[in-house]
Amino acid sequence: MKKRSFAIIALATLALSLTACGNGGSAAKTETAAAGEQAKAEVKEMKGDAIKKIVEDKKEKENYMIVDVRSPEEYAAGHINFAINMPIDTFKDNVSRIEDWKDKNVIVYCNSGKKSGEAADILASNGFTKVFNGEGVKKYSYDLKTFGNIRAKELMEKAKDALVVDAREAKDFEAGHFATAVNVNSEDPATIDAILPDDKNTLIITHCYSGNRSAKAAEYIASKGYTNVWNCLDGTKEVEYAFSKGDK
């Protein structure tokens, strides 16, 4: 009888152990799932005043990627300085375009904050850790720009078919530049006027060291009625371009 009792007790103990293990496994899965949910970054709101200060500070703006999620037409009509365009309709498919900013500050905005809120959630769900939903252009009076902004990959793809306006210092231009590039001084409009083509629809891309001088050149060119002007945000300080030396 004692042997039988011991056997029954042993089986009961084993059953309890298995049950505990089973519950522990479920608990572990629940904790893992919860941890995964917690890993999704919190989207923060950013007021127009704060964005204005960022884009007006040449050094501080280097710490932020600003993304306009409105339509290309709305973007072309006027957008926040240094903002690239990633329309909400195709936003999810183009997240890789700013993949290198996954652990840096990304501000998304639209007209009212609704579409940019959707975009912000998409970024957070894709592992972006510092996402801000910026105040919309219909809620804050921004100094909007009409020239576009692109990144290094787009510059390299389009350079051969564009008039590339290099706003770096002459010595750096002479050391190496894009084959289709011309050198200008962004502080001297006369040097820009001298290289502008007659066709106002010509694709013109400006670039420099960090996007500041080139933005000034792009704004001036756009003010002269040119309709296809783009500034590259990624300058030679951020990207090592495959330059060549030429006659220009």
Language-model regions: role of each:
Residues 2-9, 18-64, 72-105, 111-163, ...:
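Rhodanese-like catalytic fold shared by cysteine-dependent sulfurtransferases
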Residues 68:
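Phosphate-rich cofactor/ligand-interacting catalytic cores and adjacent structured alpha/beta frameworks
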